[in-house]
């Protein structure tokens, strides 16, 4: 039995910014502000409170709500110790179906001192109301053990709420690394808490086949298991180098067969049914994906007649695909999906359709014959022929098809739904909706949750406006919603998966649910801070948000102040200045620290249970104003040299052949530069006055910044969108500047410059060459 009080969590708010002072208050729970994620449309609150009685019952006015009532009882009973019964008719808490204004999923939640009523316009609406009720209770309600000393009180409220988008989803890739059915259920629990209603299950890929298909047993007997590949080996390396057990390969996913160490796992069809039922109770639909025509190596390596040639493997970029010219291959695909469709009741199935290596098709006589017979001019049209054929097959079985945005390229059918992921394919949303097709937004720049999170990631999701991508406002109703994708090449464990997905998942949930007119980042940050205690009690291994108040490099003149803040009020910060990794025995950061000499700090956050978080290094550099040079450049802007570069280090760009030279007004990729990109940008920056300047360099992939011959920012190496910030003290006048950048299918480069007052300096008149 756990002994603690509801107010005890307030003492954990040891490190937070002034932004979060509202989250750390000793106000009694009965009059606390409502702090729900995602933000409800309308909340009315008074000073009275409802206190959960031991005699609490949950009443239902419709038998279809029995699973929802049992679900709610399962939330409330363990921590309170109350034996909460479900009954027909009214109860202390009453669940009902009825007319509620708004899209499907709308609900009303009304509480007074004696009763709680939740009414939804659908089963999903009642579940949404339950999740709001759940967040009104103290976070200890999430405990699986009885918690003593808590007033199970909630404020008296009237909430009228409805979703903004119908689709609020998360995709989990279980092929690259496998997650057990219980680990999937745990993710579904978090999704439900934040009113997310679509779970996209990426069940197969080159690296593993994860679903039992009874007609083709080798798919799981062999296709579900592999020797350690390059992804596994890199995860193991990182687990050792960074002392991070979350990057280790779980022993439960390893077996020894004839002396070989194999990694993998799969779901039986009974497992699949169990997870579907679990999700249904929580108002979540499951969308299965068997990715084809590409990403099928786990299948084509085990069955003949599926690929173009007997020899399979990797082409120029991607793996050998299914052969759309062979009837046997098409029969195989339809047989697989026939079993899948029998298992999954939701109307959508996802065919994938992305990243297909078409080289084999050009050489394959079967593919070329198929093209001639159907008057197809290109291999892209051949892919579309296959997609359309499969879609008709799905439609005949009562299903609708979703595909990644590549399915647009050879011609889009009238009934397909597109999932837009390639942020660089800017015309895909308008092209899709212009043809009248629905679209789901999951652009990789913001919504790929396998990309390393930084201090801007959550805000970038929260502030994203999907409608800005649709040129014709009349087509905006075709936007079904948003989805975050967790690709798992580098995510080997349940702990790492949760770390990468959360708290970004909460921002996606709010973007998908809440009214855009109510968008307020600071208010969301306060509500987000209130969620961490709840997630801790749920044993969710979320990522502690980045520490704030400093840059990667910080310049000071005379005396500097290290003033650190953290969005998570439960986080504890420890630090060292000798380069060693902080532990709980290292000095604890509990307030501003003065520095008078150049000092290297290493910070590390710790969860309430003592588990360490990220390691952050920063340098505070004692500086003088670097003198300006006597140059008098006559041309505005900067000079960019484009190299035909295929490497992954900025220092090697100049070795590659030159494709062209360009004048640019700001730090950017010139419009004509495409393909293999290595840029060396040179010129001068004109400091308007003696000051300490802050440079924020955002790139996807690598970049570096050098000023006056000194490196200010190192953002090198292949990576997703990442911003690194550094400072330098500059005297008034011109200073030589060099930015290097390379692209490995990212296509983002920009830099913001601000003075010591924090105001961004416009690029106009800032650069010259």
Where are these regions (language model features)?
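Hydrophobic helical h-region of N-terminal Sec-dependent signal peptides
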Residues: 11-15, 19
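Short beta-strand-plus-loop segments that form exposed binding edges in beta-rich domains
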Residues: 738-747, 753
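C-terminal motif of bacterial Sec signal peptides marking the signal peptidase cleavage site
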Residues: 21-23
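Short, compositionally stereotyped local motifs that mark structural "simplifiers"
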Residues: 8, 12, 59, 515, ...
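Contiguous, structured surface segment used for ligand recognition
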Residues: 25-165, 496, 512-523, 530-534, ...
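Feature activates predominantly on carbohydrate-active enzymes
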Residues: 102-104, 108-321, 326-330, 338-348, ...
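Flexible, acidic glycine-rich loops studded with aromatic residues
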Residues: 401-406, 411-416, 422-563
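Active-site neighborhood of glycoside hydrolase catalytic domains
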Residues: 299-304, 310-415, 422-436
């Amino acid at each position: 039995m756990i002994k603690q009080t509801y107010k005890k969590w307030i003492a954990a708010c040891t490190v937070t910014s002034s932004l979060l002072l509202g989250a750390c208050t000793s106000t009694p729970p009965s009059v606390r502000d409502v702090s729900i994620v995602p933000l409800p449309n309308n909340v009315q609150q008074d000073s009275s409170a409802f206190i959960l009685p031991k005699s609490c019952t949950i009443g239902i006015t419709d038998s279809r709500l029995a699973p929802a009532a049992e679900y709610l009882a399962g939330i409330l009973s363990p921590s309170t110790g109350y034996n909460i019964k479900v009954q027909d008719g009214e109860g202390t808490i009453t669940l009902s179906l009825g007319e509620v204004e708004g899209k499907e999923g709308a609900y009303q939640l009304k509480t007074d001192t004696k009763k709680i009523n939740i009414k939804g316009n659908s089963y999903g609406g009642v579940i949404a109301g339950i999740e709001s009720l759940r967040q009104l209770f103290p976070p200890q309600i999430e405990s699986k053990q009885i918690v003593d000393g808590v007033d199970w009180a909630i404020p008296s409220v009237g909430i009228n709420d409805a979703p903004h988008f119908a689709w609020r989803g998360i995709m989990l890739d279980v092929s690259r690394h496998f997650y057990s059915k219980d680990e999937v259920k745990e993710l579904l629990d978090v999704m439900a808490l934040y009113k997310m209603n679509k779970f996209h299950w990426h069940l197969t890929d080159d690296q593993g086949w994860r679903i039992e298909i009874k007609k083709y047993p080798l798919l799981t007997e062999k296709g579900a298991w592999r020797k350690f590949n390059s992804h596994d080996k890199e995860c193991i390396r990182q687990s050792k180098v960074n002392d991070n057990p979350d990057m280790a390969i779980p022993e439960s996913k390893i077996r020894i067969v004839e002396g070989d160490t194999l990694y993998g796992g799969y779901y039986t069809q009974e497992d699949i049914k169990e997870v579907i039922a679990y999700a249904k109770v929580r108002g979540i639909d499951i969308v299965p994906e068997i990715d084809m025509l590409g990403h099928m190596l786990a299948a084509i390596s085990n069955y003949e007649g599926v690929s173009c040639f007997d020899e399979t493997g990797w082409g120029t970029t991607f793996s050998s695909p299914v052969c759309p010219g062979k009837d046997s291959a098409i029969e195989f695909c339809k047989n697989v999906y026939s079993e899948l469709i029998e298992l999954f009741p939701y109307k959508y199935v996802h065919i994938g359709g992305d990243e297909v290596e078409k080289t084999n098709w050009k050489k394959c006589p079967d593919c070329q014959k198929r093209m001639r017979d159907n008057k197809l001019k290109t291999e892209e049209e051949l892919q579309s022929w296959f997609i359309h054929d499969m879609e008709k097959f799905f439609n005949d079985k009562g299903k609708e098809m979703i595909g990644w945005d590549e399915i647009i390229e050879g011609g889009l059918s009238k009934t397909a739904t597109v999932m837009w992921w390639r942020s660089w394919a800017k015309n895909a949303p308008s092209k899709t909706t212009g043809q009248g097709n629905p679209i789901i937004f999951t652009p990789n720049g913001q919504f790929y949750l396998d990309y390393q999170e930084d201090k801007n990631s959550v805000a970038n999701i929260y502030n994203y406006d999907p409608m800005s991508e649709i040129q014709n406002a009349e087509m905006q109703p075709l936007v079904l919603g948003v989805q975050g994708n967790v690709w798992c090449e580098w995510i080997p464990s349940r702990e790492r998966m949760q770390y990468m997905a959360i708290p970004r998942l909460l921002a996606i949930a709010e973007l998908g649910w809440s009214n855009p007119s109510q968008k307020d980042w600071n208010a969301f940050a306060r509500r987000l801070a209130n969620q961490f205690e709840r997630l801790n009690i749920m044993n969710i291994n979320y990522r502690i948000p980045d520490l704030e108040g400093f840059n990667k490099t910080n310049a000071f003149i005379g005396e500097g102040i290290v003033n650190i803040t953290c969005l998570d009020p439960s986080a504890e910060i420890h630090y060292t200045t000798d380069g060693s990794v902080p532990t709980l025995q290292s000095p604890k950061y509990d307030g501003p620290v003065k520095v008078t000499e150049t000092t290297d700090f290493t910070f590390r956050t710790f969860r309430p249970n003592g588990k360490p978080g990220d390691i952050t290094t920063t340098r505070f550099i004692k500086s003088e104003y670097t003198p300006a040079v006597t140059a008098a450049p006559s041309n505005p802007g900067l000079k960019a040299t484009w190299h035909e570069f295929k490497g992954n280090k900025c220092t090697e760009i100049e070795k590659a052949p030159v494709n062209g030279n360009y004048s640019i007004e700001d730090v950017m990729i010139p419009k004509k530069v495409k393909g293999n990109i290595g840029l060396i940008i040179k010129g001068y920056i004109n400091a308007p006055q003696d000051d300490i300047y802050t440079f924020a360099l955002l790139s996807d992939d690598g970049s570096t910044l050098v000023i006056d011959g000194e490196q200010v920012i190192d953002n090198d190496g292949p990576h997703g969108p990442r911003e690194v910030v550094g400072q330098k003290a500059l005297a008034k006048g011109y200073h030589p500047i060099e930015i290097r950048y390379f692209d490995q299918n990212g296509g983002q480069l920009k830099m913001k410059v601000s003075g010591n007052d924090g105001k961004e300096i416009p690029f106009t008149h800032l650069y010259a060459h």
